[in-house]
C-alpha cells in the first residue's frame, strides 16, 4: 500500500510540474481507484470488528452495525 501511495504522489507532483502522458494519467486513475478500494476494505474490516460501549458498560453499537456483524458471522 505504501508503494501505491508513493507512486500516486509521484505522479501528482509530476502532473503539477510538467503534466502527464495519457498512459501516466491512466495509471494515476487506476492507482487511485485501487488505493480507495483497499482503504474502504480496511475501514469496513475495522468497523465490523468494533463494539461501542458507554460509560456504564452498556453496548451502544448502532443497530445497522450490529446487523452487519451478525450477517458477517453467519456467512463464515
UniProtKB/Swiss-Prot annotation:
Subcellular location: Cytoplasm
SUPFAM superfamilies xrefs: YnzC-like (SSF158221)
GO CC annotation, single: cytoplasm
Main location per the UniProt record: cytoplasm
Xref: InterPro entries: DUF896
Pfam name, any one: DUF896
Keywords noted in UniProt: Cytoplasm
Family matches, as Gene3D superfamilies: Helix hairpin bin
PANTHER family to which the protein is assigned, alphabetical: UPF0291 PROTEIN BC_1827 (PTHR37300:SF2), UPF0291 PROTEIN CBO2609/CLC_2481 (PTHR37300)
Annotated family: Belongs to the UPF0291 family.
HAMAP family xref list: UPF0291
Stated name of the protein: UPF0291 protein BCE_1981
Native species: Bacillus cereus (strain ATCC 10987 / NRS 248)
